[in-house]
């Protein structure tokens, strides 16, 4: 899967750091576990060895995934993002039409940078998909697992 992903400079650097830790620390730890398990003798019935090999497989898959993401990433400059419509890296101020006009703010980011605790939602999430391309004043109706959400877009800006 070679889909291009869009990241901020910070998001790109976080993925690079995660990859560095996996390659230079985690990989070595797993190899040590495998060596220790091998030292216990018969590998045919060695659960510790099997677990270490499984951990190695997962670690290598994670490394390959991060390498792929980093190689296909486009780093976006927030200064270049337009605010005429909702795009990736724009922040939107929304009025929740179901909760007495409660104001909500989200920043749309790639799946790799999404963090709902920080108000960063993925452009691939139901809310993100519904907001992309919309303009100030538009009302959106969004189907989510908990039901239906209704928002009005009040403002589009870049932080």
Swiss-Prot record:
InterPro entries: GreA/GreB_C_sf (IPR036953), TF_GreA/GreB_CS (IPR018151), Tscrpt_elong_fac_GreA (IPR006359), Tscrpt_elong_fac_GreA/B (IPR028624), Tscrpt_elong_fac_GreA/B_C (IPR001437), Tscrpt_elong_fac_GreA/B_fam (IPR023459), Tscrpt_elong_fac_GreA/B_N (IPR022691), Tscrpt_elong_fac_GreA/B_N_sf (IPR036805). Residues 47-73 form a coiled coil. The keyword RNA-binding does not apply. PROSITE patterns: GREAB_1, GREAB_2. This is Transcription elongation factor GreA. One of its GO terms (biological process) is DNA-templated transcription elongation. It comes from Chlorobium phaeobacteroides (strain DSM 266 / SMG 266 / 2430). It comes from the Bacteria. Pfam families: GreA_GreB, GreA_GreB_N. Necessary for efficient RNA polymerase transcription elongation past template-encoded arresting sites. The arresting sites in DNA have the property of trapping a certain fraction of elongating RNA polymerases that pass through, resulting in locked ternary complexes. Cleavage of the nascent transcript by cleavage factors such as GreA or GreB allows the resumption of elongation from the new 3'terminus. GreA releases sequences of 2 to 3 nucleotides. GO terms for molecular function: DNA binding; RNA polymerase binding. Keywords: Coiled coil, DNA-binding, Transcription, Transcription regulation. Belongs to the GreA/GreB family. The keyword DNA-binding applies. NCBIfam families: greA, PRK00226.1-2, PRK00226.1-4.
